[in-house]
Amino acid sequence: MSELYDILVETPPTKVILLALDQGLRDCERSLAELSALCEANHMEAVAQVTQKRQTPETGIVLGSGKLEEASLAAETLGAECAVFDGELTGSQIRNISNALGGLEVIDRTMLILEIFRSRAVTNEGKLQTELALLRYRLPRLQGMGEALSRQGGGGGGGGGARRGAGETKLELDRRHVHARIDALAEKLAEMEKRRGESRKARAKTGMPVVSLVGYTNVGKSSLMNALCGPSVAEADMLFATLDPTSRKLILPSGMAVLLVDTVGFVSRLPHNLVEAFKSTLEEAAWSDVIIRVADAGDEQREEQLAVTDEVLDGLDCADIPRLTVYNKCDKPGAMSFDPDILLTSAKTGYGLDTLLAKLDEVLSDRVHTLKVLLPYDKLGLAAPMRERGSVQVEEYREDGLYLEGIVKTEDLHCFEGYLV
């Protein structure tokens, strides 16, 4: 009975304290609020915050020794088992801060996000991408550990040198192992990216325009997809609930079929290693005909969150793709927008979904076109854009040439000038 009770009772979250250096470069209060939410997503509870305003970090420990004493006392008093730093630390900084806190475990913001991704990864590709990001994060920290081994082994005499040599040998083995694993993961992911590219080509041949939902994590992208297409995608009120892109067919009011893609959510200062590891997944947005930027209508930081979304998109060569902006969760108190170009929706109540679908129809009407063409037999190569990036719906070999009816993208219209029927 007690074993069953243990299974049914949820393990309480790990208590942590948050540490931050406020250099006046960003809103420290908002950043810590987001860090607290990230902790919650990793089954942690932030029980205290210790911040320090200073222009330059303290050498080796980032915060001043007095602040770290304050943090150590808070951790001991409140029973915190870990300190989470709002930023990225080097291996030596993590070690020095941990020593100053009496041996308390220390992680940084990057490690926290990577751990969340690791726990959320479901598909094989997602797991490999996360492992790659984790290894790239840890590799330079192995080097920091090597410096510590050198200092420890430098006490003098042949014995010290022997200890240092043994330590450095183990470090080199660790480095080689990590480098080899990184290379192996990169090779596997490159093969998966090749297959993803083949899937994109197959998808393009259907002629269905692609619409991607992008935005900050936990703004309701999956809920919006389910509201538009019918329940299928897993929903959860948590950060990074979706790591792998999910595609669903959506019929617009005009009868046009489109492919709606739900993508991984963003967060401010998304770790570079994570962006690199998930680049092939994030690049789904770059193959879209329309991008829907989704924000939480009730979140005061929605404009900042959209700015983060645009920053990531700009790095993925999406500048020329039309974008719609949607404030989802408009049923929440305080949700509003005075901008006529912003669409208000509620995946929960269905409000605004018809308007969103009509707007998609309007935008896509400028992106795809239905054509009837007759190509002379010495010009059959001109059919390639319709076959590869659009769709062929009717194909007839006639006496005077090849007759085609189908869908083409706007950028391919010029290929058929002079051959329209």
Segments from the language model and where they lie:
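C-terminal-of-GTPase-core extension/linker across diverse P-loop GTPases
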Residues: 1-17, 140-219, 225-226, 230, ...
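N-terminal accessory targeting/assembly segments
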Residues: 1-114
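Switch I (effector-binding) loop of TRAFAC-class P-loop GTPase G-domains
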Residues: 2-4, 196, 202-209, 227-259, ...
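Conserved C-terminal guanine-recognition region of P-loop GTPase G domains, centered on the G4
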Residues: 5, 30-40, 72-77, 87-104, ...
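Conserved beta-strand segments of the P-loop GTPase G domain that flank and frequently precede/overlap
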Residues: 18-22, 49-52, 84-86, 292-296, ...
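Flexible beta-alpha connector loops of hexameric P-loop NTPases
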Residues: 22-27, 56-61, 120-126, 170, ...
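Conserved nucleotide-binding/hydrolysis micro-motifs of P-loop NTPases
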Residues: 22-26, 54-56, 88-91, 111-114, ...
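Short alpha-helix plus adjacent loop in nuclease-associated cores
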Residues: 111-130
